[in-house]
Curated annotation (Swiss-Prot):
Gene: rpsL
Assembly behavior: Part of the 30S ribosomal subunit. Contacts proteins S8 and S17. May interact with IF1 in the 30S initiation complex.
Gene3D superfamilies membership: Nucleic acid-binding proteins
Keyword terms of this UniProt record: Methylation, Ribonucleoprotein, Ribosomal protein, RNA-binding, rRNA-binding, tRNA-binding
Annotated protein name in UniProt: Small ribosomal subunit protein uS12
Organism of origin: Prosthecochloris aestuarii (strain DSM 271 / SK 413)
Amino acid sequence: MPTIQQLIRRGRTTKASKTASPALEKCPQKRGVCTRVYTTTPKKPNSALRKVARVRLSNKIEVTAYIPGEGHNLQEHSIVLIRGGRVKDLPGVRYHIVRGSLDTSGVADRRQGRSKYGAKRPKGAAAK
C-alpha cells in the first residue's frame, strides 16, 4: 500500500488491456488477399476438416482466418473481409472471414441465421 506522498510523486499506472485481435488495429474489419486456402484438423476431443485461409491484410500483416458455413468459393488471390473472433478448437485462428462480402459468396440454401452467412431471403418465404 503506497503512502500519499508516494502517490503524489509517482501516481497510479493504468493497466493496458491486451486486444484479442491485434492485426485489425482497432478497426471493426479489414480487407485482405487470400494467400493459401486449406483445411486443418481441430484440437483433441473434436474431429473434422475445418476450412481456413491464410490472408495478407491491407496493413501487410498475415493472419489465419476461419471460413464459416457450408461450402465456399475462396481460392488464392480472392479478396476477403476479415472480422475478429477466434475458433476455440483451432489454435492460432483468431479471425473470421465475413461471408457475402467482396469475393466471398454467401452460404447457399441457408434459411436460419442468414445475416451471419451473407444469405439472401429465399423467394418462397411465406408471409408471417
